[in-house]
Amino acid sequence: LPVMISETAADYYHSRTPAVAREVSRASQISGIEDNSMLAQFTGHLHADVNLYENFIDLFGVKFASPLSNSGRSFYKYFLVDSTNAEGRKTYKIRFHPKSVATPVLDGEVNIDSASYALRSARVKMAKGVNVNWIRHLAIEIDNRLTADSLWFPQREKMTADFTLTKSESSKMLAFLGSREVTYSDVKFDTPIPKQILGTSANVVLSDDAISGKRVEWDSLRPYALSQKEKTIYRMVDSIQQVPLYKNIYTVLNTIIGGYYNTKYVGIGPHSKA
């Protein structure tokens, strides 16, 4: 059952000289549970930067060997399974499997542009047998596109994790799914960064509309329309909080993870003092 869904629309600015990396949040909305501190302990890691060009990828505090690593052959077996034509460009479909799960590794396939050897897309998952705390399954989707400036740029990134409080594969009562999807649109190069953006030292700033709480039309902000599944989630997340069974399950999970039980006036749990 869905318990929370959130959306953020933001403008990203990046420059090498001068070195600038800024995010300007235009709008944000959250539907579902109000106190998401318990979920944040797990889902916060879904915001990790997944760059397969790096030799190792930090996922949930664990370094996974990238399939595009310089030393990839030490960790993976590669198979050229197909050669296709994607948007008029020859593309190699390469499947890879881990040689061993003694170290954190992935499993899946990548599509490589034959002319530039750039990553066009990837569908990878945590290899079966890899042990990461709280994670039962992990899947990553990456799509890149060729821009007008002949540069490959991220188009879509999605990470989905199956979190669990037990190690049993069959456990459903103490498990939940978390998913994060990012879509990049309206990419521009060689465009001057506004002076007000350069003048702030904060990596993340709020736009004037976000600060004022101005009501926004999300349909105009989204680069794509919500799927039917996402629309259904929005309708369900608010109503489900009134279901007694849901309240009881959330209270139990919050107590197990947080170590204490909140009442109206006090929190009941272990006592400690410094």
Residue spans for each PLM region:
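Surface-exposed extracellular loop regions of Gram-negative outer-membrane beta-barrel proteins
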Residues: S114, A118-R123, G269-A274
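Extended lipid/amphipathic-ligand handling interfaces
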Residues: G108-V110, S114, A139-D149
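Short, hydrophobic/aromatic-rich segments at coil-to-beta transitions
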Residues: E87-R95, L119-R123, L151-R156
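Short, solvent-exposed aromatic-acidic interface loops
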Residues: V124-G129, K158-T166
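Structured extracytoplasmic
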Residues: L1-K93, H97-V105, A161-G269
